[in-house]
Design a protein with these regions (language model features):
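Membrane-spanning helices that line or support transport/gating and their immediate boundary helices
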Residues: 25-28, 72, 76, 129-140
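Conserved small/polar residues in nucleotide/adenosyl-binding loops
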Residues: 211-215
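Structural signature of hydrophobic alpha-helical transmembrane segments
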Residues: 4, 27-35
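Central hydrophobic cores of alpha-helical transmembrane segments in multi-pass inner-membrane proteins
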Residues: 33-44
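Transmembrane alpha-helical segments and their cytosolic interface motifs
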Residues: 177-205
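Short, hydrophobic transmembrane alpha-helix segments
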Residues: 17-27, 46-50
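Residue-level signature of catalytic and energy-coupling elements of molecular machines
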Residues: 29, 67, 134, 187
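Interfacial loop/helix-cap signal at membrane boundaries in integral membrane proteins
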Residues: 7-10, 14, 18, 38, ...
Length: 215
């Protein structure tokens, strides 16, 4: 059952890309995505060591892919709404999308566009680019420090300060740390691509609302 979970999840995401979702199911998936992201954020902040949350890169990839698929699904519903009725856009897109959009934009398209421009600067230029650079530097420094750490373990073992079991544990920890930061480097690049795609999708939604708003 566990071996079939990942293929089933990937297949479900592909189905969402092709088949239009009912607004109720989309609302449930959006709420679940927000809840999972919040739990991941809290868990990541409360950890003292990176290896205490070693599954974070894989979870980050999964939730990023889920968010991208939900963005595409919500955009399909928005673009498929009746253009002659602007109210239908929010109704078809679901309560979560319309409610969050109305809360952030305050019911004004101009305010929504300004908020969108600010989010572009903050998310892409500051957060995403900075996180990508931090992941690259950390992964590089971790890999460069591996030989020195291995030599230190061998020196402690030769001096009798630690036994073979402790040396094996430390070597495994160094390898796991290098794997973690390497995976984070790849995941950060995936997140950056998702940020670009999300900004483009949001821009398309704004243009759609421009043409569907009453003159």
């Amino acid at each position: 059952t566990g071996d079939l979970l990942l293929p089933a999840a990937v297949l479900g995401l592909l189905v969402v890309l092709v088949v239009p979702l009912p607004s109720t199911i989309l609302d449930l998936l959006l709420v679940a995505n927000i809840a999972i992201a919040s739990l991941m954020l809290i868990n990541a902040i409360t950890q003292h060591k990176a290896l205490e949350f070693s599954s974070f890169p894989a979870l980050l990839l999964g939730t990023t892919l889920l968010r991208l698929v939900l963005n595409i699904a919500s955009t399909r519903l928005i673009l498929g709404a009746d253009a002659s009725s602007p109210a239908a856009v929010g109704e078809v897109a679901g309560a979560v999308s319309s409610g969050f959009g109305g809360f952030v934009a305050g019911g004004s398209l101009i305010v929504g566009f300004i908020i969108f421009a600010i989010l572009v600067i903050v998310q892409f230029v500051v957060i995403t680019k900075g996180a990508t650079r931090m992941s690259e530097v950390t992964a590089r420094f971790t890999l460069d420090a591996m030989p020195g750490k291995q030599m230190a373990i061998d020196a402690d073992l030769s001096a009798g300060l630690i036994d073979e079991q402790e040396a094996t544990r430390r070597r495994g920890e160094i390898t796991a740390e290098a794997d973690f930061y390497g995976a984070m480097d790849g995941a950060s690049k995936f997140v950056r691509g998702d940020a670009v795609a999300g900004l483009i999708i949001t821009g398309i939604n704004l243009v759609c609302l421009l043409y569907t708003s009453p003159s």
